[in-house]
Regions:
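Transmembrane-helix signature of 12-pass secondary carriers
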Residues: 1-234
Length: 234
């Protein structure tokens, strides 16, 4: 495969972490009116349900440093994808689970953990696999992913809300809004198994030959040697 195309594909896969950041943050906006009616929430509880994901974001972001060192940038992104998937599935509260607003909050916090980890590890991973001259432009893919995520979830929640009656939206429409995140979450999870580990992390783990092999897949041989030397010197 062409090295440039391979690099772009790796970047796009990583940027899905940003897309899910935007999607998970935005989906609650479309669902909040209907789930508030369903659970008969007062203003305080509604605010807690909407804002609870931020608690997970904080914890996820704080934990991401040690996590990314322990299992790598790629491993951390896989964890975030699993958390996004669990949150998307659980926030819709499947019929075999007890219908509780507290349970919804738990799943929203789990999604927030995914956001916090992805917000730190996705741009870090992109920066560490990118050639120095292209690093800045490629990292912006992550920011673009966030905006695209917001836009897609707006379209999805609008479509679901418009094609159901208000009673249907209150009963199950809001569940479908949350479940719609399962698609991109599982896609992110699957694709992550096909991207390489961060060469910088591999160096930190003493796996220098493996790191150089990754660099050669992304860069021309001379550039790979230069970047490898820079990592060794840093």
């Amino acid at each position: 495969m062409n090295k440039n195309l391979y690099l772009i594909l790796i970047t796009i896969v990583s940027a899905l972490g940003g897309l899910l950041f935007g999607y998970d943050t935005g989906v609650i906006n479309g669902a909040q009116f209907f789930l508030s009616k369903y659970f008969e929430l007062n203003a305080g509880m509604k605010g807690w349900v909407v804002g609870s994901a931020l608690l997970g974001c904080l914890v996820g972001a704080l934990a991401s440093g040690k996590l990314s060192m322990a299992i790598g940038r790629k491993g951390s992104l896989i964890v975030s994808a699993i958390l996004f998937s669990i949150s998307a599935w659980g926030s819709g509260i499947p019929s075999f689970l007890p219908e509780s607003v507290d349970l919804l909050v738990v799943f929203r916090i789990i999604g927030g953990l995914g956001i916090g980890i992805a917000s730190m590890c996705a741009p870090m991973y992109i920066a560490e696999v990118s050639p120095p001259k292209r690093r800045g432009s490629l990292v912006t893919f992550y920011q673009l992913g966030i905006v695209v995520g917001f836009f897609i979830v707006f379209l999805v929640t609008y479509y679901i809300g418009r094609n159901l009656t208000e009673a249907q939206n209150i009963d199950f429409g809001w569940r479908r809004m949350f479940w719609s995140e399962l698609g991109p979450s599982l896609l992110f999870l699957i694709l992550l198994f096909f991207v390489p580990k961060s060469p910088r992390w591999l160096h930190l783990m003493g796996r220098k030959e493996e790191a150089f092999e990754v660099l050669k897949k992304i860069n021309e041989p001379e550039v790979a040697k230069k970047v490898n030397a820079e990592i060794l010197d840093s």
